[in-house]
């Protein structure tokens, strides 16, 4: 850890079309090898697909999807007397958003549709409807935390 104190969080600029920092963060998660233009094109096309299929504002659908994917609890490994325990802890608000975005992109990449735009659009729409792999990941994370509730007193 640095001795100079905590490293400040760097703030991202809001994206040009939706004027949202969340959208910029999602673009950065989609981006591979620094190709931001391509990542933007993927996201904006996915948003167009969402608008076309649902008839709703894609930002509303995306925000609902993110809300449904963000975890409240997670488990962290804690070593006590030679044994590793999975200790349930609450997730910090900034980490909730990060994990939600990460899982949306991760499970969109694993889908079977032809293009990344379609995969991302479908994953976001599924998450907004409380279905899909990203929501399942959140449920599994919560189940793990629930199952290890007995070790909650090891929290730090």
From Swiss-Prot:
Keywords: Ribonucleoprotein, Ribosomal protein, RNA-binding, rRNA-binding, tRNA-binding. Part of the 30S ribosomal subunit. Contacts proteins S9 and S11. The lineage of its organism: Bacteria, Bacillati, Bacillota, Bacilli, Bacillales. GO terms for molecular function: rRNA binding; structural constituent of ribosome; tRNA binding. Pfam families: Ribosomal_S7. InterPro entries: Ribosomal_uS7, Ribosomal_uS7_bac/org-type, Ribosomal_uS7_CS, Ribosomal_uS7_dom, Ribosomal_uS7_dom_sf. Coiled coil: none annotated. One of the primary rRNA binding proteins, it binds directly to 16S rRNA where it nucleates assembly of the head domain of the 30S subunit. Is located at the subunit interface close to the decoding center, probably blocks exit of the E-site tRNA. GO terms for cellular component: small ribosomal subunit. This is Small ribosomal subunit protein uS7. Belongs to the universal ribosomal protein uS7 family. One of its GO terms (biological process) is translation.
């Amino acid at each position: 850890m640095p001795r100079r104190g905590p490293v400040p969080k760097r703030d991202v600029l809001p994206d040009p079309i939706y004027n949202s920092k969340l959208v910029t963060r999602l673009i950065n998660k989609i981006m591979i090898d620094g190709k931001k233009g391509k990542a933007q094109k993927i996201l904006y096309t996915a948003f167009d697909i969402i608008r076309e299929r649902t008839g709703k504002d894609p930002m509303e659908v995306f925000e609902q999807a993110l809300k449904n994917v963000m975890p409240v609890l997670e488990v962290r490994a804690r070593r006590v007397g030679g044994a590793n325990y999975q200790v349930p802890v609450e997730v910090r608000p900034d980490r909730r958003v990060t994990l939600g975005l990460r899982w949306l992109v991760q499970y969109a990449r694993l889908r079977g549709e032809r293009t990344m735009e379609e995969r991302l659009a479908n994953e976001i729409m599924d998450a907004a409807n409380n279905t899909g792999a990203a929501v399942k990941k959140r449920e599994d994370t919560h189940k793990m935390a629930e199952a290890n509730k007995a070790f909650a007193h090891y929290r730090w």
